[in-house]
Curated annotation (Swiss-Prot):
Keywords tagged on the record: Antiviral defense, Endonuclease, Hydrolase, Magnesium, Metal-binding, Multifunctional enzyme, Nuclease, Nucleotidyltransferase, RNA-binding, RNA-directed DNA polymerase, Transferase, Transposable element
Binding site for Mg(2+): 120, 201-202
The protein's name: Retron Ec67 protein
Top-level lineage group: Bacteria
Job of this protein: Reverse transcriptase (RT) component of antiviral defense system retron Ec67, minimally composed of a non-coding RNA (ncRNA) and this RT. Expression of these 2 elements confers protection against bacteriophage T5. At multiplicity of infection (MOI) of 0.02 cultures grow normally when infected with T5 without collapsing, at MOI 2 cultures enter growth stasis. Responsible for synthesis of msDNA-Ec67 (a branched molecule with RNA linked by a 2',5'-phosphodiester bond to ssDNA).
Family label: Belongs to the bacterial reverse transcriptase family.
Segments forming domain Reverse transcriptase: 29-262
Organism: Escherichia coli
EC code: 2.7.7.49, 3.1.26.4
């Protein structure tokens, strides 16, 4: 089904079966999840502290329900794009959880303004009850859905009768329903020389006038009083204003839009960056950092939370760099200094702090063994092999937090443009040699803290790592002084928590690569009449290379492949885990 036909298909649907086809799920799955088990029985609730006082309740759906909700989100997003195209509407007002929109773009719309009005909608998602959601799909002129279809969509979207925070489809449904309000408020703002935008429950209206239009808001002794017309439009749209969060700010003071300062450029509040850096410093020194929970009690924070904070700061910096035409992609990821630590010269202070955290997450504070490979195809091989051999290596798996299913308990490092920029690590033995050369300096930068898990480089036993092995022979006292001996070892302990595993030499002593661990009948598989050549990275008229082999043979046919030759790698990983555990306890 093409993208442009989805709205018509949804309008034409008259049954759950029709809806299931549009969502590309089986009817029995849709019915079982929504009705037999019951959508209300498939949520886990937890709270997170709000920026100010109080807590925010998150309702996280199960994987099965989340899958349906994501499909509904994609469907409704496509329908909305089609509606806007038909009606020639440009969505310049709603920025929350929208395709191509962000919290930064929302703030950017109000940068450098004289006066900014911030309005908060009270209990935003709770304002969308089951009847309101169902009624929208039934009566809105853009949809006019069949009652069965409208009811099923509302059933999938709502929890305890309202849209929950935590569902993938809550944002798109709320934005659809808010569309009329957005257009009316934008028109009202424009009438009085103001700019309007909304990010979920945060409404922002700004102006370059020296005084804010009286029709929009005034400052009274008791505080900011919103104009009657403005209040009427919001309340008629089914929302209540949280008066305690209404505020007017002027250019002479700090102006914020959805948590970002906008006086001159869009920026992170300095206190936020200092807090993030301080939390990271505590993590490096003690192995943990503390944040207050919903009751104000200090509890240990996770790596993901801190990474989110650093990532948000970097996202804002990158946005400003692009706007200033500095470090514009792809130039941002091009290194100009080839010395060992030269890549850091391109990083500003914030980026250096983020770089240090990323390194810590993967190689010093890693909560499970980190596996580094030479390239992306090796990652695919190892994952497919380990899943196939799961019963033989239960210690290399863990239960998922939200289900009884198992997942690999190894962090198989994925290199990309981001890791190249922040870590100078994008795969290939040249990068890995520099990684080892820098390891001691990086290790020392975490104030003597000791990693709890090993870092394991899994490499081909061919000419690729020759320079690295020669470096170990000449510069690392703990390693053998004979490269030939190293090539025969089950694993090499370099120093600290760093190890190397090489593919085993052939029975005749010849060098090998990871592809040599596959059975001959798998290596002989032809794709489109072409033979596999492990030394061919491209795709010629007669041969195909590693990428196609990894995707169309290993990934697509993994259930039919005998991966027993990979046991040598996983046995080595098991032994390394035990070796490092003994080191920590000695």
């Amino acid at each position: 089904m093409t993208k442009t036909s989805k709205l018509d298909a949804l309008r034409a649907a008259t049954s759950r079966e029709d809806l299931a086809k549009i969502l590309d799920v089986k009817l029995v799955f849709l019915t079982n999840v929504l009705y037999r088990i019951g959508s209300d029985n498939q949520y886990t609730q937890f709270t997170i502290p709000k920026k100010g006082k109080g807590v925010r309740t998150i309702s996280a759906p199960t994987d099965r329900l989340k899958d349906i909700q994501r499909r509904i989100c994609d469907l409704l997003s496509d329908c909305r794009d089609e509606i806007f195209a038909i009606r020639k509407i440009s969505n310049n007002y709603s920025f929350g959880f929208e395709r191509g929109k962000s919290i930064i773009l929302n703030a950017y719309k109000h940068r450098g303004k004289q006066i900014i009005l911030n309005i908060d909608l009270k209990d935003f998602f709770e304002s969308f009850n089951f009847g309101r959601v169902r009624g929208y799909f039934l009566s809105n002129q853009d949809f006019l859905l069949n009652p069965v279809v409208a009811t099923t969509l509302a059933k999938a979207a709502c929890y305890n009768g309202t849209l929950p925070q935590g569902s993938p489809c809550s944002p798109i449904i709320s934005n659809l329903i808010c569309n009329i309000m957005d257009m009316r408020l934008a028109k009202l703002a424009k009438k009085y020389g103001c700019t309007y935008s909304r990010y979920a429950d945060d409404i922002t209206i700004s102006t370059n006038k020296n005084t804010f239009p009286l029709e929009m808001a005034t400052v009274q002794p008791e505080g900011v009083v919103l104009g009657k017309v403005l209040v009427k439009e919001i309340e008629n749209s089914g929302f209540e204003i949280n008066d305690s969060k209404t505020r007017l700010t002027y250019k002479t003071s700090r102006q914020e839009v959805t948590g970002l300062t906008v006086n001159r450029i869009v920026n992170i509040d300095r206190c936020y960056y200092k807090k993030t850096r301080a939390l990271a410093h505590a993590l490096y020194r003690t192995g943990e950092y503390k944040v207050p929970d919903e009751n104000g009690v200090l509890v240990s924070g996770g790596l993901d939370k801190l990474e989110g904070m650093f990532g948000f700061i970097d996202q804002v910096d990158k946005f400003n760099n692009i706007k200033k035409k500095l470090n514009k992609q792809p130039d941002r990821y091009v290194l100009t200094n080839a010395t060992l630590h030269g890549f850091k010269l391109k990083l500003n202070a914030r980026e250096k702090a983020y770089s240090k955290f990323i390194y810590y997450k993967f190689f010093h504070g890693n909560t499970c063994p980190t596996i580094i490979t030479e390239g992306k195809t090796d990652r695919i091989y190892l994952k497919a092999a380990l899943h196939s051999l799961e019963t033989s290596y239960p210690e290399l798996f863990r239960e998922k937090t939200d289900s009884k299913k198992k997942e690999i308990n190894l962090n198989i490092f994925k290199s990309n443009e981001k890791t190249k920029y922040f870590l100078d690590l994008s795969g290939g033995t040249a990068d890995l040699k520099k990684f080892v050369e820098r390891y001691k300096n990086n290790y020392a930068s975490y104030y003597g803290s000791v990693p709890k898990q090993p870092v394991i480089m899994v490499l081909d036993n061919d000419t690729g790592p020759s320079d690295l092995l020669n470096f170990l022979r000449n510069k690392v006292k703990s390693c053998p002084d004979d490269v030939t001996e190293m090539r025969k070892m089950k694993y090499i302990h370099v120093f600290y928590n760093l190890y190397i595993v090489l593919t085993p030499l052939s029975p005749s002593g010849e060098q090998t690569s990871m592809e040599d661990l596959f059975p001959k009948d798998i290596l002989d598989i032809k794709i489109d009449g072409k033979k596999f050549n492990k030394n061919n990275d491209g795709d010629s008229k007669t041969e195909y290379g590693k990428h196609i082999f990894s995707m169309r043979v290993v990934r697509d046919k993994k259930r039919k492949i005998d991966f027993k030759a990979f046991c040598c790698i996983f046995d080595a990983i098991k032994d390394i885990k035990e070796h490092y555990k003994l080191m920590l306890n000695s």
